[in-house]
């Protein structure tokens, strides 16, 4: 454990236990709700206006804005080399510490993503903006924006909106705005959809 660099104007609503290793960063002006039992390992970068339910673990992850992370989610879990003599990396690598993480390929959770309870996202995977991942899914491959994916391994079952609407949502960039501006942009998008 170590210090978590947070800007002076950052606001985190914390549960009883939040463990952060050094190298965990939050954006300036951050406002997140982080429930108890959450552990963030370095390096992690967290956007604004996210909700982390209890007992979330994140390793080497980049998380966008306005995400809802369900209870018991595991982000950025590493693989063990099952073809090596030992499954323990420190034995195979001759290192004193476990070297399982691919720091050059973080796990990326876009903005406005909803991860249901107990979702596992493997290291190096990208989940696109607006995607929804069903409870207990194991995400082993990239998931496109606004997709709905479920299962083990997670597979895209449908999309939240039609292709044209997804394009408009992504272009609007509403999830990069503060809440009041984001709400206004979303209202405008709703009005445009009703006209069609």
Question: What are the residue ranges of the model-derived segments?
Answer:
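Extended, small-residue-rich solenoid/repeat segments and analogous flexible loops
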Residues: 1-40
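Conserved catalytic-core motifs of eukaryotic protein kinase domains, centered on the activation segment
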Residues: 79-81, 143, 159-161
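Catalytic-loop signature of eukaryotic-like protein kinases
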Residues: 112, 130, 147
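C-terminal segments of enzyme domains that contribute to small-molecule binding surfaces
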Residues: 14-17, 23, 88-121, 153-196
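Glycine-centered loop/turn positions within well-structured domains
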Residues: 83, 141, 145-147, 155
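Conserved G/P- and acidic residue-centered "switch" motifs that form tight phosphate/ATP-binding loops
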Residues: 133, 151
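Beta-rich strand-turn-strand
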Residues: 118-131, 137-141
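Flexible, glycine/small-residue-enriched loop-and-beta-strand segment within the central core
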Residues: 15, 33-36, 40-47, 51-123, ...
């Amino acid at each position: 454990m170590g210090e978590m660099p947070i800007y002076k104007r950052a606001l985190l609503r914390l549960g009883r236990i939040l463990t952060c290793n050094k190298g965990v960063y939050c954006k300036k002006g951050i406002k997140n709700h982080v429930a108890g039992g959450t552990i963030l390992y370095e390096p992690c970068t967290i956007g604004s206006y996210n909700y982390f339910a209890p007992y979330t673990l994140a390793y080497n992850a980049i998380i966008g804005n306005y995400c809802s992370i369900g209870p018991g989610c595991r982000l950025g879990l590493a693989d063990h080399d099952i073809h090596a003599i030992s499954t323990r990396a420190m034995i195979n690598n001759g290192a004193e510490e476990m070297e399982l993480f691919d720091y050059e390929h973080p796990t990326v959770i876009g903005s406005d993503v909803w991860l249901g309870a107990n979702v596992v996202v493997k290291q190096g995977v990208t989940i696109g903006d607006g995607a929804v991942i069903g409870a207990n899914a194991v995400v082993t491959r990239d998931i496109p924006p606004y997709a709905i994916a479920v299962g083990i391994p997670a597979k895209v079952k449908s999309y939240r909106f039609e292709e044209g609407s997804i394009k408009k949502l992504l272009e609007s960039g509403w999830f990069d705005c503060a809440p009041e501006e984001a709400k206004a942009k979303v209202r405008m998008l709703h009005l445009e959809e009703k006209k069609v």
